[in-house]
């Protein structure tokens, strides 16, 4: 741990009066006095949430990124802090283009002139982890090939990140041990989540894989374009993508002048979101306006694939159940769905959770449906969840953040956008497919290889369970065996029914 970096953090906390958090804490009274020895001018004129944001900005890009991640954890933070941290911007001066050139050559093992016809040393975009340069691939005959964006990892960033993460882990441990609310805030868990997020961003091949997956999911789509990845020109430090031409989605007047149908575009955004979540179970989780452009043909263009989310079939099912129940005001079903999914502890009383959900949702539903925010519904529920010791899953936090971005974007394009009217047919159709014959056939097809493997092993499993010397293992093994036997019998019965139906049809 760097002493100079630690001292800078202490001085910054004191400058913005954040040592006030220590006030009244008997075990930390000596620290509060030590802060007073800092030879730094103290400014406490701004509200405390704003001072937290300013302190993070002063501590540099890694702390800014941490604040951005923290702003999504509305299940942990009071609203005024989450709102203030959401204002943080990842603004970092670019590093020298010649250094970027050296990184490319070292990482790809070839001279830039051998890889590209032109490589613009002036970056078109810069952030804390990487910056982007424009280039053209060199064809075998030496001619100019495809226009590309070359994303280059900032050199020397890893030691800086590891140093700051080490300090964050130490601070998180202190908060958890010394503050009454420390365990509920789960600071070490939040830092661990941030650690994973940062290290994913440091590996350009991780982003390349995300882009490829999303591109495959939307192949031939009339709503979304995802740039092609050039793997022969990519590595852990360099990512080369197809250059995309378009208008930034936030430039509404330019879109109008280009003849883009803004109402259609806003609906596309909602449909793209729900398609990613419920069809693919894999979604772009950083869809703020800076990462979205609009092509000449009116399709969205997605950029920056460092942050994605994924959902299991169970997550998708309960999300759909919750959305449909919310907008039908079936709060009891919302409560039971939360308990069934494991999002709240099993011993939670459904009636108490139902009452809490009703308290959150009824004021929201007094508004016209076109003004209701899906994201705000989830946000309010996250805030309510603190009363019920809810374990908010990271993928659901990403989902809520993405949904807020999509809603904000959609209503910026079309203030009259009725999100529920756009989403309900999609959700209803998806649910019908899951519980109807199509869903059954899809499940049978998916599970068939597992049945073929599992059924022959049942006698051996029974013998192993009966031969166990420990009673608890015997009982557990027997229960598990009976459950599996019932499941297999039920599925075999369904197969028999389907085969009989097909046979009867062929005989008619």
From Swiss-Prot:
Signal peptide residues on this chain, from the entry's feature table: none
CDD domains associated with the record: UbiB
Protein name: Probable protein kinase UbiB
Recorded family membership: Belongs to the ABC1 family. UbiB subfamily.
UniProt KW tRNA processing keyword: no
Residue numbers binding ATP: 124-132, 151
Recorded GO MF terms: ATP binding; protein kinase activity
Entry annotation: catalytic residues: 286 (proton acceptor)
Topological relation to the membrane, as annotated: Single-pass membrane protein
Main location: membrane
UniProt-listed GO biological process terms: regulation of ubiquinone biosynthetic process; ubiquinone biosynthetic process
Disulfide pairings: none
TM segment ranges: 488-508
Keywords, sorted A to Z: ATP-binding, Cell inner membrane, Cell membrane, Kinase, Membrane, Nucleotide-binding, Transferase, Transmembrane, Transmembrane helix, Ubiquinone biosynthesis
Documented EC number(s): 2.7.-.-
Function: Is probably a protein kinase regulator of UbiI activity which is involved in aerobic coenzyme Q (ubiquinone) biosynthesis.
Gene responsible for this protein: ubiB
All copies of domain Protein kinase, residue ranges: 118-494
UniProt organism field: Chromobacterium violaceum (strain ATCC 12472 / DSM 30191 / JCM 1249 / CCUG 213 / NBRC 12614 / NCIMB 9131 / NCTC 9757 / MK)
Record-level GO cellular component terms: plasma membrane
């Amino acid at each position: 741990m760097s002493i100079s970096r630690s001292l800078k953090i202490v001085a910054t906390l004191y400058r913005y009066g954040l040592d006030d958090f220590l006030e009244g804490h008997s075990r930390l009274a000596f620290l509060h006095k030590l802060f007073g020895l800092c030879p730094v001018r103290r400014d406490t004129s701004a509200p405390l949430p704003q001072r937290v944001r300013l302190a993070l900005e002063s501590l540099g890009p890694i702390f800014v990124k941490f604040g951005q991640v923290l702003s999504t954890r509305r299940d942990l933070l009071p609203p005024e802090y989450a709102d203030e941290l959401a204002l943080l911007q990842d603004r970092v001066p670019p590093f020298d283009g010649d250094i970027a050139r050296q990184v490319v050559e070292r990482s790809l093992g070839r001279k830039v002139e051998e890889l590209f016809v032109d490589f613009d040393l002036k970056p078109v975009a810069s952030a804390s982890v990487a910056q982007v340069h424009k280039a053209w691939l060199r064809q075998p005959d030496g001619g100019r090939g495809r226009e590309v964006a070359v994303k280059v990892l900032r050199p020397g960033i890893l030691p800086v990140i590891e140093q700051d993460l080490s300090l964050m882990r130490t601070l998180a441990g202190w908060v958890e041990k010394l503050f009454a609310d420390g365990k509920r805030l789960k600071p070490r868990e939040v830092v661990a989540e941030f650690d994973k997020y940062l290290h994913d961003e440091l590996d350009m091949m991780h982003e390349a894989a995300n882009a490829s997956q999303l591109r495959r999911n939307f192949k031939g789509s009339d709503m979304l374009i995802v740039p092609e990845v050039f793997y022969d020109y990519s590595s852990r430090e360099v990512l080369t993508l197809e250059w995309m031409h378009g208008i930034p989605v936030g430039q509404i007047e330019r879109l109008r002048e280009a003849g883009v149908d803004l109402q259609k575009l806003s609906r596309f955004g909602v449909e793209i979101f729900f398609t990613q979540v419920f069809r693919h179970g894999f979604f772009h989780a950083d869809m703020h306006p800076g990462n979205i452009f609009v092509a000449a043909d009116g399709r969205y263009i997605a950029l920056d694939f460092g942050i994605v989310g994924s959902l299991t079939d169970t997550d998708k099912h309960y999300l759909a159940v919750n959305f449909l129940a919310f907008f039908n005001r079936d709060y009891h079903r919302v409560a039971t769905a939360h308990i069934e999914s494991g999002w709240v502890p099993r011993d939670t009383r459904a009636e108490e959770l139902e009452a809490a959900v009703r308290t959150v949702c009824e004021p929201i539903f007094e508004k016209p449906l076109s003004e209701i925010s899906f994201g705000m519904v989830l946000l309010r529920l996250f805030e309510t969840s603190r009363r019920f010791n809810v374990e908010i899953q990271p993928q659901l936090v990403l989902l809520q953040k993405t949904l807020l971005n999509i809603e904000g974007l959609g209503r910026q394009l079309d203030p009259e956008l009725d999100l529920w009217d756009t989403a309900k047919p999609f959700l209803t159709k998806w649910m019908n497919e899951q519980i109807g014959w199509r869903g059954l056939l899809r499940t049978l097809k998916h599970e068939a290889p597992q049945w073929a493997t599992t059924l022959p092993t049942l006698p051996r499993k029974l013998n192993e369970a009966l031969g166990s010397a420990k009673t608890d293992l015997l009982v557990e093994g027997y229960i598990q065996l009976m459950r599996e036997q019932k499941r297999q019998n039920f599925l075999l019965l369904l197969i028999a029914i389907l085969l009989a139906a097909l046979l009867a049809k062929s005989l008619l």
